[in-house]
Amino acid sequence: MPRSKSYNTYSSLQRPEFRKRVDELLLKFERDFYEKSKGAEGMLDANKFDLDLYKRHNVETMIRIGLKRAVDPLVANYWATRDPQLSKEWGLYGAEEGRHDRMFAGDLHKVGMTDEEIYAIRPTFATELLNGYFYYTLATEGPLASMISGFYLEYIAGKTQPDWLDIMEQHVGANNTKGARAHLALDEDDDHVDMVWNMIMRVIKTEEDEERFVEHLTKINSLFVSYFVEVYAATVLGLGSDPSQLTQVSPGAAVQTNLQARVAAV
């Protein structure tokens, strides 16, 4: 049974052959992240758990949700006169996802952070760049990049977060990750990965559209990888008090990740 008003109502997966290609690309992104991003392998090692990294990761998740909450209504509005059904579906999805930041806030409260402390933290440069990309592409070509980001997050969270939470719970306790677990459970029960995919496939019509999808996906992945590198540098490496160094970390990691993905695709 669906747990929210935003669940997969499509009878079948749209453009399955293209999805197979995208799944393979996302699996490569995940593998490269663990192999090439400094500190990433530690997310799977209980001996390398860092409480500050855990807190900062959850705070950034809340920040991203809050920022996306302002973008999703623009996506729904864009489709209002072009594809009213898609406008309705995306509106419901954005309204549901936009409330999930409080799930993570509950987990942070349990490890000693107050709302005042949470909301005093500014987004990483990588998150600022990501949201700038959403607004830029929305103004110049439409909301596809922002929509693809929704699919990317649903897919990657389903692949990575269960293992990460298993490690985290060894240190903070399962009672203190209930918000993150509830978020995953809702996404799984309402089949958000395939739902968001099917919504996007309503507007993917040609091979050129598919290539643009892959280009957006590659850039979005590079910015999410750079977000992790930036958060790791700020917490585990202790660079959080030096903003000048952190602002160099993000674009450097993004460019490197993007180039690696493009070289591998040739």
Protein language model regions, located:
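Non-heme di-metal
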Residues: 2-266
